[in-house]
């Protein structure tokens, strides 16, 4: 392997989230030192994933099946659709094991600055899924950012006229959180979303 190939590997690793040039160099060196036990299996796994993983045509998640294992699971509640920004958010909800409905992955958020409009997020696919039934509630699990809230309002305006309940995740003080350590936005959201005890 020439220095150019090593530099290319480092450059590609540095493009991964959370890895800068120094971390990428350390990762590349680690891989090179453990070629048989780590690099070769990693190359095989990457090749297999590249060849077999695709977007689910129904919800937009990543899976080796089409439709994905979540959409194809008859035990999932088809009356609930949870809308998430990306696959990482879906995985986070699945890790919690609390939601038993189906998902819709937007693949991003509306952003005038970045030129992302409703057509880029497949909102027409979401509207079609809701229209086909038997959906009774759409849960918006979107970030509490300007883009997330803008996206939520657009989706609510699209879905609510169809007589479907549109809800959002609760926001506020996390379990075990101390008020002194929370930012002003979180405290404001918590006060506005207060409920009877």
Curated annotation (Swiss-Prot):
Annotated coiled-coil segments of the chain: none
Gene Ontology MF annotations: DNA binding; zinc ion binding
UniProt KW keywords: DNA damage, DNA recombination, DNA repair, Metal-binding, Zinc, Zinc-finger
Signal sequence annotation: none
InterPro entries named in the record: DNA_Rcmb_RecR, Rcmb_RecR, Rcmb_RecR_Znf, TOPRIM_dom, TOPRIM_RecR
Pfam families the UniProt entry points to: RecR_C, RecR_HhH, RecR_ZnF, Toprim_4
First and last residues of each zinc finger (C4-type): 56-71
Domain annotation Toprim: ranges: 79-174
One BP term from GO: DNA recombination
Gene3D superfamilies (UniProt xref): 3.40.1360.10, 6.10.250.240, RecR Domain 1
Entry keyword annotation includes Nuclease: no
Keyword Metal-binding found: yes
Similarity section: Belongs to the RecR family.
Task of the protein: May play a role in DNA repair. It seems to be involved in an RecBC-independent recombinational process of DNA repair. It may act with RecF and RecO.
Record protein name field: Recombination protein RecR
Lineage: Bacteria, Pseudomonadati, Pseudomonadota, Alphaproteobacteria, Rhodospirillales
């Amino acid at each position: 392997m020439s220095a150019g190939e090593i530099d290319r590997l480092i450059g590609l690793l540095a493009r991964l989230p959370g890895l800068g040039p120094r971390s990428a160099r350390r990762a590349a060196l680690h891989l090179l030192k453990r070629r048989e036990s780590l690099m070769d299996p990693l190359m095989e796994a990457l090749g297999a994933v590249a060849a077999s993983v695709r977007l689910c045509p129904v919800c937009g998640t990543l899976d080796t099946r089409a439709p994905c294992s979540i959409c194809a699971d008859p035990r999932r509640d088809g009356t609930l659709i949870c809308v998430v920004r990306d696959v990482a958010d879906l995985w986070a909800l699945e890790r919690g094991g609390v939601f038993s409905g189906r998902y819709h992955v937007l693949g991003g958020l509306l952003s005038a600055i970045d030129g992302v409009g409703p057509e880029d997020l497949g909102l027409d696919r979401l509207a079609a899924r809701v229209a086909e039934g038997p959906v009774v509630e759409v849960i918006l699990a979107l970030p509490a950012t300007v883009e997330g809230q803008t996206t939520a309002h657009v989706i609510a305006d699209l879905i609510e006229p169809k007589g479907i309940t549109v809800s959002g995740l609760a926001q506020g003080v996390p379990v075990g959180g101390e008020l002194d350590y929370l930012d002003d936005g979180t405290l404001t959201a918590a006060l506005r979303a207060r409920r009877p005890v």
